[in-house]
Amino acid sequence: MGKNVVVLGTQWGDEGKGKIVDLLTEQAAAVVRYQGGHNAGHTLVIDGEKTVLHLIPSGILREGVQCLIGNGVVLAPDALLREITKLEEKGVPVRERLRISPSCPLILSYHVALDQAREKARGEAKIGTTGRGIGPAYEDKVARRGLRVGDLFHRERFAAKLGELLDYHNFVLQHYYKEPAIDFQKTLDEAMEYAELLKPMMADVAATLHDLRKHGKDIMFEGAQGSLLDIDHGTYPYVTSSNTTAGGTATGSGFGPLYLDYVLGITKAYTTRVGSGPFPTELFDDVGAYLAKRGHEFGATTGRARRCGWFDAVILRRAIEINSISGLCLTKLDVLDGLDVVRLCVGYRNADGDVLEAPTDADSYIGLQPVYEEMPGWSESTVGAKTLEELPANARAYIKRVEELVGAPIDIISTGPDRNETIILRHPFA
């Protein structure tokens, strides 16, 4: 009997999911992306060689692992084809192992133009999107006007829908944002070129998953971004446009929730965030700079510097509840090496002095101050440790306190970027 495991982020993204998915896929028959788009950036380091993936599931570097892109992913054909080419140049076979749902909404040039025009118009109040068209593509999907991958293979139907879409979006671009219109013929010609290249990779992803399940195969579902960026459960409106939480697994792949056996939540030993939005434990001092430098905190997709702060047990407790987390993976523990004192946020205090749990919208964070516990740090290195006993006593105490504060076990500890620099206390597929 196979096991079906979800791996997702429990903070604001960038928790180190790519490495863990790559590590665990040694046992998986297939890896599935079920939401998001090429706004994700999953970094893998294998024997010192770094690979960044945006759309292709992180199992692609494991020989024989099937990689699936489910219907919940918004797909930019140009970005996907560039990613395939880069991997193939490294000798990684992709096309025969990658399968894409024809129900994936397409991201085309007008989505990118709209995304960037909106952020430009917002000025200082911008959301902090990647500018890659993710939000506008999801809007078209929900408005039931979007083009999907399957439409690419019906030229006349595609052209008719594209014409209607460009009439609508070009009106907004030209008359509201004062930006140039997107050319119909150029967009159509590019799309038809994509169609020829994508057609061999089309498949009914839901049917593929259920066939694997019936044959007792292990399946991994790879989340993108983080739980606090979820369109419904995140710090709205500073969120992404998809469901980044465990519920998105079913809707974004066609694999029912009762088939899932284990949900692994990835969390950093501290907290980071890219772009705008509330961040109660954010640091603006030397410690924040230390975390950013030691943790190489720059976005894999945009290159933007990440905001850094202390570990926040409040947001993690919320993420554990909404995802029904089975166990946690604590990443980047080694970044805390060398600090005299480490802090953990255990609650938020408002102006009345009351200690609160995590709010559900951005405005409710205004005026909240973090309540901290302090613990002694450690001077010894944790880099590359492969057993719990190899860790300094204070690091072990920190791990134990995190478990106590959030009410979930830490099953995996990452002690470096390479897939081998990991302590596995309980294997999700065991």
Swiss-Prot record:
The annotated pathway is: Purine metabolism; AMP biosynthesis via de novo pathway; AMP from IMP: step 1/2
How this chain assembles, per its entry, is:
Homodimer.
* UniProt main location, coarse: cytoplasm
Output one GO BP term: IMP metabolic process
Q: Where does substrate bind?
A: 300-306
Positions with a binding annotation for Mg(2+): 14, 41
Q: Which SMART domains match?
A: Adenylsucc_synt
User: Which family does the entry's similarity section mention?
Assistant: Belongs to the adenylosuccinate synthetase family.
Q: What is this protein called in UniProt?
A: Adenylosuccinate synthetase
Q: What is its EC number?
A: 6.3.4.4
Q: Which UniProt keywords apply?
A: Cytoplasm, GTP-binding, Ligase, Magnesium, Metal-binding, Nucleotide-binding, Purine biosynthesis
Q: Which NCBIfam families match?
A: PRK01117.1, purA
| Gene it is expressed from | purA
